[in-house]
From Swiss-Prot:
It is found in: Cell inner membrane. It catalyses: GTP + H2O = GDP + phosphate + H(+). Required for accurate and efficient protein synthesis under certain stress conditions. May act as a fidelity factor of the translation reaction, by catalyzing a one-codon backward translocation of tRNAs on improperly translocated ribosomes. Back-translocation proceeds from a post-translocation (POST) complex to a pre-translocation (PRE) complex, thus giving elongation factor G a second chance to translocate the tRNAs correctly. Binds to ribosomes in a GTP-dependent manner. This is Elongation factor 4. It comes from Albidiferax ferrireducens (strain ATCC BAA-621 / DSM 15236 / T118) (Rhodoferax ferrireducens). GO terms for molecular function: GTP binding; GTPase activity; guanosine tetraphosphate binding; ribosome binding; translation elongation factor activity. It comes from the Bacteria. It is a peripheral membrane protein. NCBIfam families: lepA, small_GTP. GTP binds at D14, H15, G16, K17, S18, T19, N131, K132, M133, D134. Keywords: Cell inner membrane, Cell membrane, GTP-binding, Hydrolase, Membrane, Nucleotide-binding, Protein biosynthesis.
Amino acid sequence: MNHIRNFSIIAHIDHGKSTLADRLIQRCGGLQEREMEAQVLDSMDIEKERGITIKAQTASLKYKAQNGQIYNLNLIDTPGHVDFSYEVSRSLSACEGALLVVDASQGVEAQTVANCYTALDLGVEVVPVLNKMDLPNADPDNAKIEIEDVIGIDATDAIACSAKTGMGIDEILEAVVARMPPPRGNPAGALRAMIVDSWFDTYVGVVMLVRVVDGRLAKGERIKMMATGTTYNADSLGVFTPANEPRESLEAGEVGYIIAGIRELQAAKVGDTITLIKAGTGGAAFTATEPLPGFKEIQPQVFAGLYPTEASEYESLRDSLEKLKLNDSSLRYQPEVSQALGFGFRCGFLGLLHMEIVQERLEREFDQDLITTAPSVEYQVVQADGTVKMVENPSKMPDQGRLDEVREPIVTVHLYMPQDYVGAVMTLANQKRGVQMNMAYHGRQVMLTYEMPLAEIVMDFFDKLKSVSRGYASMDYEFKEYRAADVVKVDILLNGDKVDALSIIVHRSQSQYRGRAVVSKMREIISRQMYDVAIQAAIGSNVIARETIKAMRKNVIAKCYGGDISRKHKLLDKQKEGKKRMKQIGSVSVPQEAFLAILQVDA
């Protein structure tokens, strides 16, 4: 076990994590030259295009150190984005060390800090690396100061490297061997292996990526998941070098994969502990009683409705979501019906990036045409009789009279930006009902800490943050608590009928403004009818905004010329009567753009 090192790479988006991983794989001869393509570990197209890592991947590398010994290095790739923080914490808890990669030209960014704190909390040895040293504007001294200031780890012997040119790669590998501890664990104890990641393969079912902590697992043995209690046969084992290499057994300290004929991803939950079941006398000694710490069920935070543009596509959308869920266990969905949009699904996501990626994968990999409703968050509603109910769909919110209080999710937001943009970012955060908790200067960077309602972030906070800071600000957030808030449901009515898909939940202080904005936008979109159409925004029975689309009408008195006024009145009254009858039986169709209009109303 002393010759095994498990490590991962922590970096902000675009700081060169995947390129560095490629270089390390190449240096250790993990792939032949011809198989070496850019970003070997990012296997999804969307990962390569957006330059982000979504799922954790691994590579087991053999490295001959300068002292002549051969070491087994297991590189566990981690996602860098804040939405995937649970996957990051699982990847990191499988490691003893981490390379903290910082772009020498840009310095420390928000998600680096968030993930680095996770690593330090888990007791992982962090080795700082300054990447992109080949750039003319690299400023290693400033980057070192920022690492020490913001993260608080010693950066005097940070390794300078450039993943692009290959400079400093050997120094990194030596540091992994010298500065990171070997795995801790009991090779002779009962088997305990943690699932770091799992994905679905069409030929063999679910593939689980595991880190064996104690004991050993041989091919063909019976394994048990401790969170769900289900048992399976370990049909095949192996390691990734990134290509897969079958093995007869996995020992304590190793990272490898297990294929056990599992059909659905729900059974292999990320972070769960696997142990052995052995029959016969003394078999109990092989079964662990205590699972590994840190496992938790992932809870979605952002909800939106997904509807097919054609009602006949509903079944194929369901199939697509089922297939997508095989590879993305954090996606939640359930069928829902809307009067305006027909049949569709209410989906739960980890965050906005996760929502975008799911939408994009549905459209790209499954050819779906989708309508997405405005994203909303889950509210805790305390009803008048004292029962607490979770509401994530605005149209399911009970009436004001039956409510005691509504609690909304509050998150702690960390914002990092250069000093020049502090004023603009603070103004934006205050508009979004943020409460400033802290402000700290680190060299040229400033870190602001706010408490904000998640509902304000999911609408368009990230886009606005980027625009007021010209793209320099970065953010990450974590859930804090539910807190009582004065939020109301604004319904949109057409001729007195509610349109369920257009309901929104907003803070009372913004309800007038948002209601008026939606109503005036709707007036532009809905076409004129033969009778007046009243568009109203209402809170309960209290109308807060109204616009009227005037009827198209024929000039019925054009043929009269002179003549008696009573004759004209008779014709006008007859027309009025006809319009009234029409209005009773007519219905207004809501065009597609109306639902998108809600998204575009600036808060």
